[in-house]
Amino acid sequence: MSVERQWYLYLLECTGGSIYTGITTDVARRFAQHQAGKGAKYTRSRKPLRVLGQVAFPSKSEALKAELATKRMSSAQKIAFCAKLEQPET
């Protein structure tokens, strides 16, 4: 029986004021990848400035569902959502 890793939904503030949403098992590692230009295509042209927040999920499936719901939010809704999230120590 395999043990699933904990997955995180994370939101990044990017240049131009945009907000990027993604999922990962390691937020600090993924943020570093985005900053190095090796993350998502979106963050290659809109450099990430900081992690706005993160929230843990017990499975990838649950994190993906939350990611989809978050990506459907407006920027104002994402900012309000981030105010409630676990703040990273990066």
Swiss-Prot record:
InterPro entries, alphabetized: GIY-YIG_endonuc, GIY-YIG_endonuc_sf, UPF0213_domain
Top-level taxon in the UniProt lineage: Bacteria
Domain GIY-YIG: 5-80
SUPFAM superfamilies named in the record: GIY-YIG endonuclease (SSF82771)
Annotated PANTHER family: UPF0213 PROTEIN YHBQ (PTHR34477:SF1)
Family that this chain belongs to: Belongs to the UPF0213 family.
Protein's name in the database: UPF0213 protein Reut_B5558
